[in-house]
Amino acid sequence: MFELVDNVPQSPVIKVIGVGGGGGNAVNHMVKSSIEGVEFICANTDAQALKNIGARTILQLGTGVTKGLGAGANPEVGRQAALEDRERIAEVLQGTNMVFITTGMGGGTGTGAAPIIAEVAKEMGILTVAVVTRPFPFEGRKRMQIADEGIRMLAESVDSLITIPNEKLLTILGKDASLLSAFAKADDVLAGAVRGISDIIKRPGMINVDFADVRTVMGEMGMAMMGTGCASGPNRAREATEAAIRNPLLEDVNLQGARGILVNITAGPDLSLGEYSDVGSIIEAFASDHAMVKVGTVIDPDMRDELHVTVVATGLGARIEKPVKVVDNTLQTAQQAYEASNPAPVRQEQPAVNYRDLERPTVMRNQAHAGAAAAAKLNPQDDLDYLDIPAFLRRQAD
């Protein structure tokens, strides 16, 4: 008798954990966006801030350290709070395949706790991606320095890192934009990235891209960029792809030489081969010759005219080796530098002057010099050799 065994693997588990006040706001935004197939967690040291969070899982950090009153903008307090609840962090991440960590850098809880959470996730073998924001310049140099140090520590434990400078919000939206709409725009970057990755992994496609492909492209890659684009009309493929790779809110990174690229195209049954080719051509333009490129397609029967493109580019910011120019750093004076570039002509040795000879008349001196020169030219041996030649030959030579 045969027994049916279900060997179909379970769908990969994706979680988003917002750390601190900024991370909690981002999680709230995504919960309202109704992103399917993703679990949300919010971690904070401030008990009051956790009361208004719509996440399914709430994780209060460091009650013994902070007494539920927050980290007081001190990253070290945030770090100690995360270390205190390290085991609880591991519990909420149990069974996770991929985790997004989001926070606003420069404060206490997010800056200090996010690197610890990333460290725990990496130790558990979870594909870890961080999406963080940098402070506004007017928030002060001290806060910016704290943020930079936090990003540096976070980068050591995550597979891929996406940075959004708040300053870009002013540039793109203008000073008249409301504060709520500005931060919602930044949260849209994270929401778009999470939704795009979720669609790539969980929605089967005609040309399928699975979680193993995502891990290959995003694992241990460092600086990353994620973008989504949507367009309709005759040039929808090109317009959607260009919108996905030109997100104005992301940190200024050079897309040239990306080492890993993941692309997902979602469209209706009218997706053409030419459109598929257009997307690939644009992607090829900024990929390095040795890049790992994965392009998948999902055909959605409910879509009409619209085409969605999700692009994940990783391994960005690699330095291009330039020819090495050898420079002599030896200190030189201005006179030495001039003499080195303008060498003086070689002076020939002049014979010593015989002042006694100058007492003789010029005519006699010239005759003496002429006689000496003629005598120097005459060689007695030459005359003897000349006589050895037979006379008839000497006459012919003369």
Swiss-Prot record:
GO terms for biological process, alphabetical: division septum assembly; FtsZ-dependent cytokinesis; protein polymerization
Keyword ATP-binding: no
The protein's name: Cell division protein FtsZ
Function of the molecule: Essential cell division protein that forms a contractile ring structure (Z ring) at the future cell division site. The regulation of the ring assembly controls the timing and the location of cell division. One of the functions of the FtsZ ring is to recruit other cell division proteins to the septum to produce a new cell wall between the dividing cells. Binds GTP and shows GTPase activity.
PANTHER family: CELL DIVISION PROTEIN FTSZ-RELATED, MITOCHONDRIAL DIVISION PROTEIN FSZA
Family matches, as HAMAP family: FtsZ
Keyword Nucleotide-binding included in the entry's annotation: yes
NCBIfam families: ftsZ
Location of the protein in the cell: Cytoplasm
Listed Gene3D superfamilies: Tubulin/FtsZ, C-terminal domain (3.30.1330.20), Tubulin/FtsZ, GTPase domain (3.40.50.1440)
Gene behind this protein: ftsZ
Cellular component GO terms held in the UniProt record: cell division site; cytoplasm
Protein's organism: Pseudomonas putida (strain ATCC 47054 / DSM 6125 / CFBP 8728 / NCIMB 11950 / KT2440)
A molecular function GO annotation: GTPase activity
Residue numbers binding GTP: 21-25, 108-110, 139, 143, 187
Keywords from the named record: Cell cycle, Cell division, Cytoplasm, GTP-binding, Nucleotide-binding, Septation
The family this protein is said to belong to: Belongs to the FtsZ family.
Protein origin, superkingdom: Bacteria
Oligomer and partners: Homodimer. Polymerizes to form a dynamic ring structure in a strictly GTP-dependent manner. Interacts directly with several other division proteins.
InterPro entries according to UniProt: Cell_div_FtsZ (IPR000158), Cell_div_FtsZ_CS (IPR020805), FtsZ/CetZ (IPR045061), FtsZ_C (IPR024757), Tub_FtsZ_C (IPR008280), Tubulin/FtsZ-like_C (IPR037103), Tubulin/FtsZ_2-layer-sand-dom (IPR018316), Tubulin/FtsZ_GTPase_sf (IPR036525)
